[in-house]
């Protein structure tokens, strides 16, 4: 997944260990969805919301704020699904308000289902 933040400074070489702590400063990364939305003509724009609380509320807010056609809401607070797992359980929400919840399945199956649901609309 693309991160919202990136390291402000980076080195092309190994950073040697010193006796001091190392502090990283992060800055906002570019908004890829905004860039794609600004170029959009007839494409269907799908975003992803990885959330640890208020899953549907936060996902719907992002759907509206970013003017997406669909958003795939992913609850990352569960250890058996999400980032640290090979399986996932998501809810696909359309801009018209339709919701399709997918049961826990492999991430490959989730991707296929997302594609099939959007293709079928």
Residue map of PLM features:
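Glycine-rich phosphate/dinucleotide-binding loop and adjoining beta-alpha-beta core of small-molecule
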Residues: 1-79
